[in-house]
A protein has these predicted regions:
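Short, compositionally biased leader-like segments
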Residues: 1-2, 6, 59
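Short, non-transmembrane alpha-helical segments in secretory-pathway proteins
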Residues: 4-16
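Interaction interfaces in information-processing and related assembly proteins
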Residues: 15-63
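Cys/His-clustered metal-coordination modules, chiefly Zn-binding fingers
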Residues: 56-125
């Protein structure tokens, strides 16, 4: 796995593990034609796959936030029909919506999408 992609993905995988969500199988797959993109496939236990990527030229915090957004989409699909799909759940609005990955002051954070209140650095849930 590309080192920049690994660095962007590890904090998000930490948050998945902290929530008790099984991490996907990660497979090198340069499916993107963009030379600036570092890409892999995430494979679910049911055999379905999702491609994720980061821009090599983006700042580190933006790579982490972009990866968090894509892994969150994978997790929501994975949880569908089994558990709450509100991952990670917004503490301000329980059962309302999941938090959204954004950047603030050079750090990737999970924030409320309604009022942008930051709650946790990505990787520290």
């Amino acid at each position: 796995v590309d080192e920049l992609l690994h660095q962007a993905m590890e904090p998000v995988l930490r948050d998945l593990r902290g929530a008790g969500i099984a991490a996907p199988r990660i497979e090198d797959d340069d499916w993107s034609d963009d030379p600036d993109a570092a890409a892999v496939m995430l494979w679910s236990s049911d055999g379905s796959g999702t491609g994720v990527y980061v821009s090599r030229s983006a700042p580190a915090c933006e790579r982490v936030a972009a990866m968090a957004d894509q892994v969150q989409e994978w997790a929501i699909e994975e949880l569908w029909g089994q558990a709450s799909t509100s991952w990670p759940e917004c503490p301000r609005h329980p059962n309302g919506h999941p938090m959204k990955a954004t950047t603030r002051d050079g750090v990737a954070v999970w924030s409320c999408p309604a009022d942008q209140t930051p709650f946790s650095e990505v990787g520290a849930l």
